[in-house]
Amino acid sequence: VNFVSGIKSCITVPDDLKDGLFMAEEYISGQEYSIESISFNDRHDIIQITEKVTTGAPHFVELEHHQPAHLSPSIEKKIRNIIPPILSSVNFSNGASHIEIKVNDQGDVYLIEVNPRGGGDYISNDLVSLSTDYDYLKQMILVALGEYNPVAVHHVAYAGIYFLSAYTKRLLPYFNIPLANWMVRRERKTGELTVSSSNYDRDGFIIYCSDKKIVL
């Protein structure tokens, strides 16, 4: 995968690959979000919206997740209105889903990908249960058992996660102080910090929960 922003960043294709297939896609700029949903018998319930921070091109390593996302009422309404039709259009009927989108400065919403699973990076198994009164994992099991009944979801706190890597070395002091009251959990690998090129080579994390968004 190559990120091309102009003529100077174009690449030369080797002769032995010139008969191959290539795909060029527009790069969508804007703020990234993920929508955590659950579906049962073609009904789609949005549980939470996660605001995401990444390294950007070319690797888009995820550095932060925050719930609930900071959105204007109109943008949140737009997101909540488009997600059910997206899931229905791909015939997704039952189970958890994790949908990634971007919203540009004009308020346009772009679909990035649809995942037929709960969100990783502690989104499904930690952040949702911290930021809402909704037991996401329990509801996934009830869907599998055919016993799911929709329940109201209420915002109860701000929750998020910061990932440690060479990109976020500013976080290091928070691993060397006593556990603060807003810290739910923290872990760190030993050794030098990694210049991460994927979500699989980060060096640690801090999960928080508070009555406000924690900015580190």
Per-range role (PLM):
Residues 1-2:
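Conserved anion/nucleotide-ligand pocket segment
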Residues 19:
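His/Asp/Glu-rich metal-coordinating catalytic cores
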